[in-house]
């Protein structure tokens, strides 16, 4: 049976491949594939934003090699940044429940 972190890694990888290659390179997300992934898989991150300029800026920031697509490494950097932001947010909350062992 897979541990929670192993399951999380599986979801991270399988989610990328669920959306990549629908329109081109199967190992990269183009702009519309990334937008679909974010809209369906991270709806709280985007909220009700449909601001094309903001999305274009996000795409530009993620696309570190400037090939107009987001590869798996760029996707992982993005998810890591979101995880760090979530961690920083929750560090400000007092522990109300004991930690699981």
Curated annotation (Swiss-Prot):
Residues recorded as bearing N-acetylalanine in the entry: 2
Binding site for Ca(2+) 2: 63, 65, 67, 69, 74
Subcellular location: Secreted; Nucleus; Cytoplasm
Tissue expression summary: Ubiquitously expressed.
GO biological process terms, semicolon-separated: epithelial to mesenchymal transition; positive regulation of canonical NF-kappaB signal transduction
SUPFAM superfamilies associated with the record: EF-hand
Chain ranges of the EF-hand domain: 12-47, 50-85
Pfam families: S_100
Swiss-Prot/TrEMBL keywords: Acetylation, Calcium, Cytoplasm, Metal-binding, Nucleus, Repeat, Secreted
Keyword check for Thylakoid: no
Cell inner membrane is among the record's keywords: no
Lineage top rank: taxon: Eukaryota
Entry GO terms, CC: collagen-containing extracellular matrix; cytosol; extracellular exosome; extracellular region; extracellular space; nucleoplasm; nucleus; perinuclear region of cytoplasm
Chain positions with N6-acetyllysine modification: 7, 35
An MF annotation (GO) of this entry: calcium-dependent protein binding
Residues engaged in binding Ca(2+) 1: 28, 33
Transmembrane stretches, start-end: none
Task performed by this protein: Calcium-binding protein that plays a role in various cellular processes including motility, angiogenesis, cell differentiation, apoptosis, and autophagy. Increases cell motility and invasiveness by interacting with non-muscle myosin heavy chain (NMMHC) IIA/MYH9. Mechanistically, promotes filament depolymerization and increases the amount of soluble myosin-IIA, resulting in the formation of stable protrusions facilitating chemotaxis. Also modulates the pro-apoptotic function of TP53 by binding to its C-terminal transactivation domain within the nucleus and reducing its protein levels.
Subunit structure as annotated in this protein's UniProt entry: Homodimer. Interacts with PPFIBP1 in a calcium-dependent mode. Interacts with PGLYRP1; this complex acts as a chemoattractant that promotes lymphocyte movement. Interacts with MYH9; this interaction increases cell motility. Interacts with Annexin 2/ANXA2. Interacts with TP53; this interaction promotes TP53 degradation. Interacts with CCR5. Interacts with FCGR3A; this interaction inhibits PKC-dependent phosphorylation of FCGR3A.
Name recorded for this polypeptide: Protein S100-A4
Upper classification of the organism: Eukaryota, Metazoa, Chordata, Craniata, Vertebrata
